[in-house]
Amino acid sequence: MELNSIQPADGAKHYKRRVGRGIGSGLGKTSGRGHKGQKSRSGGFHKVGFEGGQMPLQRRLPKRGFKSLATPYKAEVRLSDLEALPVTEIDILALKQAGVIGELARVVRVILSGSITKKVTVKGLIATKGAKAAIEAAGGSVA
C-alpha cells in the first residue's frame, strides 16, 4: 500500500442527490415538497415553538422561582475541604487563597459533609450545629 493509491471503500462515497432535475430522478418538479402550502414555499416555515397561533406551551405554563442575586456572595464549605487545607487557622481569606470558594464570597457556611481529623481553628465563618460538633470533637474550635 502506498499513499498515492489509498481510496475510500466501495460504497463509502455517493453523489449528492440533486432535486428538481426531471421526473426520472424521482425528485423532479416539486423536489419532494409536495403540492402548494406553506411548507412548499421558500422561506415558508414557522419559528421554533410556534403553534399556529395557539398560545404556545412556554406561555401557557406559569413562571416559577427567580435567580437570587445573593448567590455569588454565599458559599458552603465541607469539612473534607477544611481537612485538605494546609493551614490550621481558617478564615475567608485562607479559603479564597486555596481556591475553595469564589472571590466574591462574603458569607461562608461550614457544613457537616465528609469528616475532619485535624485540629483547626475556624474564624469568621458560620458553622452548622453538626459541623461545629465535628470540629470540636477533632480538637479544634469555632470562633
Curated annotation (Swiss-Prot):
Pfam families recorded: Ribosomal_L27A (PF00828)
The keyword Ribonucleoprotein appears for this protein: yes
Example GO molecular function: rRNA binding
GO cellular component, one term: cytosolic large ribosomal subunit
Keyword terms: Ribonucleoprotein, Ribosomal protein, RNA-binding, rRNA-binding
Compositionally biased tracts (Gly residues): 21-31
One GO BP annotation of this record: translation
Record carries keyword RNA-binding: yes
Protein origin, superkingdom: Bacteria
Region (Disordered): 1-52
InterPro entries according to UniProt: Ribosomal_uL15 (IPR030878), Ribosomal_uL15/eL18 (IPR021131), Ribosomal_uL15/eL18_sf (IPR036227), Ribosomal_uL15_bac-type (IPR005749), Ribosomal_uL15_CS (IPR001196)
NCBIfam families: rplO_bact (TIGR01071)
Chain's role: Binds to the 23S rRNA.
Similarity comment: family membership: Belongs to the universal ribosomal protein uL15 family.
HAMAP family from the UniProt entry: Ribosomal_uL15 (MF_01341)
Complex and partners: Part of the 50S ribosomal subunit.
Protein name in the entry: Large ribosomal subunit protein uL15
Gene symbol of the encoding locus: rplO
